[in-house]
């Protein structure tokens, strides 16, 4: 998922641990994102950080699209996998969403099972696997026959089904955050979608245009600051 919004903050949090739990951190990066990833990584890594390196790959391919030498080295090592790569566009076509979110997760699971000294899979799901259910949804409830608003929700649901089918052979922790927003203190974010899209739209309206409540003006929004999420993931993980 690097250099994505959540993954970059997760890497930063892991590097700030003292001591860092990992001797080496390997970041799988799409080829088209390599230059951006290199710049982002240079901002995060200091001289006393553990080894952090980028590996070009593709989660939809066997061995996650890595070079054979990289795949072999990781199979021999004692590793944990953090799987954050996904397509989040709520208007994404079904075929693309399925290929990235479901097929990609299956390839991650395949690779995990092929590792000789595999430790744990950390799978970042979403609270929206609950779909159109109402009321309280508990962590041990996944498939309740629910419907979904879009292909993002449905494919993340199917991806989590794939993860749960194999967690007897693959030790797994599943995280289901809500809508992830910027830092709770600074507000820093690189995102422009979700609630930010609506807020930016409202801010562009002329100041003399009256604000009108549409729908339930007192409704709650399921959001979580990225620093809270990442700190929780590091603590739980």
Enumerate the language-model features and the residues they cover:
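Short, well-ordered alpha-helices that flank and scaffold nucleotide-derived cofactor binding pockets
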Residues: 12-16, 110-114, 165, 200
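A structural motif corresponding to the C-terminal end of an alpha-helix
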Residues: 51, 111-118, 159-171
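Active-site loop/turn elements of alpha/beta-hydrolase fold enzymes
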Residues: 30, 59, 126, 177-180
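Conserved catalytic Lys-bearing alpha helix of Rossmann-like short-chain dehydrogenase/reductases
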Residues: 102-108, 155-163, 198, 229
């Amino acid at each position: 998922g690097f250099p994505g919004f959540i993954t970059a903050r997760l890497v930063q949090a892991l590097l700030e641990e003292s001591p860092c739990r990992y001797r080496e951190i390997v970041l799988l990066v799409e080829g088209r994102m390599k230059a951006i990833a290199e710049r982002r990584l240079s901002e995060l890594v200091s001289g006393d950080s553990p080894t952090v390196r980028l590996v070009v790959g593709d989660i939809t391919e066997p061995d996650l699209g890595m070079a054979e030498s990289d795949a072999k080295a990781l199979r021999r090592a004692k590793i944990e996998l953090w799987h954050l790569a996904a397509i989040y566009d709520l208007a994404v076509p079904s075929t693309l969403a399925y290929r990235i979110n479901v097929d990609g997760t299956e390839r991650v699971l395949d690779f995990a099972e092929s590792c000789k000294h595999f430790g744990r899979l950390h799978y970042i799901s979403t609270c929206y696997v609950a779909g159109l259910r109402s009321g309280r949804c508990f962590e041990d409830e996944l498939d309740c026959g629910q419907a979904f608003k879009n292909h993002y929700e449905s494919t993340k649901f199917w991806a989590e089904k794939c993860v749960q089918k194999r967690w007897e052979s693959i030790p797994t922790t599943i995280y289901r955050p809500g809508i992830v927003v910027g830092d709770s203190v600074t507000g820093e974010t690189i995102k422009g979608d979700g609630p930010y899209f609506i807020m930016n739209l409202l801010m562009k309206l002329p100041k003399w245009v009256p604000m009108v409540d549409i729908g339930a003006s007192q409704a709650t929004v399921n959001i979580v600051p990225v620093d809270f999420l990442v700190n929780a993931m590091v603590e739980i993980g």
